Amino acid sequence: PADANEVAAAWRAIMADAGHPTALILSRQALPTLDRTKYASADGLAKGAYVLADSENPEVILIATGSEVSLALAAHDKLVAQGVA
């Protein structure tokens, strides 16, 4: 999971479908909690993947998982500031 919100969403998904073995792999890093008013809700986690930040006609697509998500979002913010969608 990318942040505490995703940990909670993953835990809820695991508990809702507890009929088989499941692993929740967590980072030892102190990850920032993403601003979910700026980025998409963690509820998309149940789909397996989801878009956190989108643009009308993207020039670049950044893909990340887990602890790398905050780095990808920082890159996204820098690209937007430079006028790259």
What are these regions (language model features)?
Residues 2:
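TRNA-recognition modules of translation machinery and tRNA-sensing kinases, especially anticodon-binding
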Residues 5-78, 82:
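Glycine-/acidic-rich phosphate or pyrophosphate-binding loops and their flanking alpha/beta elements
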Residues 85:
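Residue-level detector of anion-binding/catalytic polar loops
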